[in-house]
């Protein structure tokens, strides 16, 4: 405001009081300045890149893309997530500051897409790795749909309580803090060998001997069925 506006404010509303809570003030500041970490692996990310141009101008929402997860509070996953990339994605998510949010963009991120039927290395939904706040279906989604997803996330932020969200994220985890897979019931269909998915150690530490042994034990008949 300039000096004239301050003078007018004092003359017309001398007894005005703004009443709010610290939680509402925190929500308002966060929804107005979301800093996303862009995690794009395939064609869906190209649609998000269209938002940077002047036609859509996503800067008006306060979005400032960051290259470091420690400076971001929103991660936008777009594209296929493989089993080899899963620990890296979880590590990026855990390095983000609390509270943090996730938008799953595209069919490949949400369900595995066309790769989920006969691929042994595709994660069938990123929500098996990290909690998702907004699902954005499409192959690929249009830039207008991305803006709508961001708007829905802003509405969700405005109604939440920060402490409850942090506790919920810590309780509902698919991975442990040291990035090891939990033993869960298989969500994959088919009769092929899935022993490679459940490991007792880090997922990145797979010996080549074990990999090729598991790969050779799968017959073409089992893959077809």
Curated annotation (Swiss-Prot):
Q: What does the note under cofactor report?
A: Binds 1 [4Fe-4S] cluster.
Alphabetical keyword list: 4Fe-4S, Chloroplast, Iron, Iron-sulfur, Membrane, Metal-binding, NAD, NADP, Plastid, Plastoquinone, Quinone, Thylakoid, Translocase, Transport
Which reaction(s) are listed as its catalytic activity?
a plastoquinone + NADH + (n+1) H(+)(in) = a plastoquinol + NAD(+) + n H(+)(out); a plastoquinone + NADPH + (n+1) H(+)(in) = a plastoquinol + NADP(+) + n H(+)(out)
Under which EC number(s) is this enzyme classified? 7.1.1.-
| Binding positions for [4Fe-4S] cluster per the UniProt entry | 43-44, 108, 139
Q: PROSITE patterns annotated for this entry?
A: COMPLEX1_20K (PS01150)
What is the membrane topology here? Peripheral membrane protein
- Spell out the subcellular localization from the entry: Plastid, Chloroplast thylakoid membrane
Description of how the protein assembles with itself and partners: NDH is composed of at least 16 different subunits, 5 of which are encoded in the nucleus.
Designated name of the protein? NAD(P)H-quinone oxidoreductase subunit K, chloroplastic
